[in-house]
Amino acid sequence: MKLTLWTYEGPPHVGAMRVATGMTGMHYVLHAPQGDTYADLLFTMIERRGKRPPVSYTTFQARDLGSDTAELFQSACRDAYERFQPQAIMVGSSCTAELIQDDTGGLADALSLPVPVVHLELPSYQRKENFGADESFLQICRKLARPMERTEKVSCNLLGPTALGFRHRDDILEVTRLLEGMGIAVNAVAPMGASPADIARLGAAHFNVLLYPETGESAARWAEKTLKQPYTKTVPIGVGATRDFVAEVAALAGVAPVADDSRLRQPWWSASVDSTYLTGKRVFLFGDATHVIAAARVARDEMGFEVVGMGCYNREFARPMRAAAKGYGLEALVTDDYLEVEEAIQALAPELILGTQMERHIAKRLGIPCAVISAPVHVQDFPARYSPQMGFEGANVLFDTWIHPLTMGLEEHLLTMFREDFEFHDEAGPSHHGGKAVPASAPRADEAAEALPLTGAETAEGGSIPPEAVPPAEAAAVPAGEIVWLTDAERELKKIPFFVRGKARRNTEKFAAEKGLTRISLETLYEAKAHYAR
């Protein structure tokens, strides 16, 4: 573990909470100090759930460490069963309680409760949230699911959706509609929405649909081996992936690969006249591996973007992420350090960022358009409306979500043609985004600099000379360390496409600083360009 301001994933017990909270009739008894109860807010405040998670905490304090914490845990188990009467109980420790090394599974078994008890041993200091969810779901399946006779009608299970998942609620509905349109019934959705009784009948399905490998792949692999159920490998995000998914499901179910795409609008919208401005837009993607790999395909093949960078924060999926990145001629960024992600974005200077809530903050600081494609997300990404990411309707949602942050094509032309216009100037931003407009008549630093006398450095032929030649008295006209752009240089800079303009500005200012210049003229800009082109 390491101390950080932001984190992409919580500790493993948060993943276990996501599984328990998504289920019905399940209760999670967590051996944890009072401070770890913060996790409740993730579900009630961020996800807007109408009830608190089915989790009981031992909430031991410092003074309890000298006494019997095991008895505290057993009391919490007894109280949880008597109060909530769950069909099954999960038991485990938080990252803090793991240091005490109480055997929560053995302690719970010693109580001889009349319901199944699922033991969770989650290595808090080696693994993180997605692993915790994946492992918890696996242990629940191992404890409760058994081979059984298949349903008469071809059916499948949907595996992987959890509480606090990115659009999981709507993805379930969209994929269920897609499957039912093919004549395939959904036997169970798990863990989200499933009860322990539903888990027990997972074996009745003919095959499994793995929606989210991060949180369901271990259970899918176990079911393939133990329940003899094959599982799908294609995640239906985007038009192409959805068609591939339909073909894969049809092969497993022995039905015709047909699906109702009458509601699909994304391909035509992407090919419409105004959408030609999408072609070649440089995009950077970061998030969980499943969503990033799927989104990269949509970005390049369906929207016409140029993928200039991609990566994931979950190291368990580093191998498939690196393999996918190679297909775009890229090296994947696999890190859980948001500062590394920010550095990569600054270096690449993309026109659009597709990422998590973290990248939304980064994009805001850098002034780059951004859309969220992956957890972790904030409250606004749990919308009241129907907004899936998967299936044909999900493809429509992707188009709208990704295009909204961008300046529209016609408006880009107006910005180019009327760059100094009161309405269509660079600082105004897209017209469909409120609260960003800056009057074109606002005084600028470069105009103020016009009145200042030039130093010997800028008046010299060629635009720059070594700093020693600048008389100290004249250099004092501008505060030390401050670099000012002159009007002609600023005007020329605006002719550079805005998606690389920031990088050009930074490089020029760096060049000027190295040369000891305090004002950037047109000649300085050209010299910097030639310097970095070498």
From Swiss-Prot:
Matching entries from Gene3D superfamilies are given as: 1.20.89.20, Nitrogenase molybdenum iron protein domain, Proto-chlorophyllide reductase 57 kD subunit B
The reaction(s) catalysed by this protein are: chlorophyllide a + oxidized 2[4Fe-4S]-[ferredoxin] + 2 ADP + 2 phosphate = protochlorophyllide a + reduced 2[4Fe-4S]-[ferredoxin] + 2 ATP + 2 H2O
Residues involved in substrate binding: 409-410
Keywords on this record? 4Fe-4S, ATP-binding, Bacteriochlorophyll biosynthesis, Chlorophyll biosynthesis, Iron, Iron-sulfur, Metal-binding, Nucleotide-binding, Oxidoreductase, Photosynthesis
How the cofactor is bound: the record states: Binds 1 [4Fe-4S] cluster per heterodimer. The cluster is bound at the heterodimer interface by residues from both subunits.
Q: Record's superkingdom? A: Bacteria
Family under the similarity heading:
Belongs to the ChlB/BchB/BchZ family.
Q: Which gene encodes it?
A: bchB
Q: Where are the annotated segments for Disordered? A: 426-446
Species assigned in the record: Cereibacter sphaeroides (strain ATCC 17023 / DSM 158 / JCM 6121 / CCUG 31486 / LMG 2827 / NBRC 12203 / NCIMB 8253 / ATH 2.4.1.) (Rhodobacter sphaeroides)
Molecular function per GO = 4 iron, 4 sulfur cluster binding; ATP binding; metal ion binding; oxidoreductase activity, acting on iron-sulfur proteins as donors; oxidoreductase activity, acting on the CH-CH group of donors, iron-sulfur protein as acceptor
Question: According to the UniProt entry, what is the EC number of this protein?
Answer: 1.3.7.7
Quaternary data: Protochlorophyllide reductase is composed of three subunits; BchL, BchN and BchB. Forms a heterotetramer of two BchB and two BchN subunits.
Protein name per UniProt = Light-independent protochlorophyllide reductase subunit B
Q: In which pathway does it act?
A: Porphyrin-containing compound metabolism; bacteriochlorophyll biosynthesis (light-independent)
- Please give the function described in this protein's UniProt entry: Component of the dark-operative protochlorophyllide reductase (DPOR) that uses Mg-ATP and reduced ferredoxin to reduce ring D of protochlorophyllide (Pchlide) to form chlorophyllide a (Chlide). This reaction is light-independent. The NB-protein (BchN-BchB) is the catalytic component of the complex.
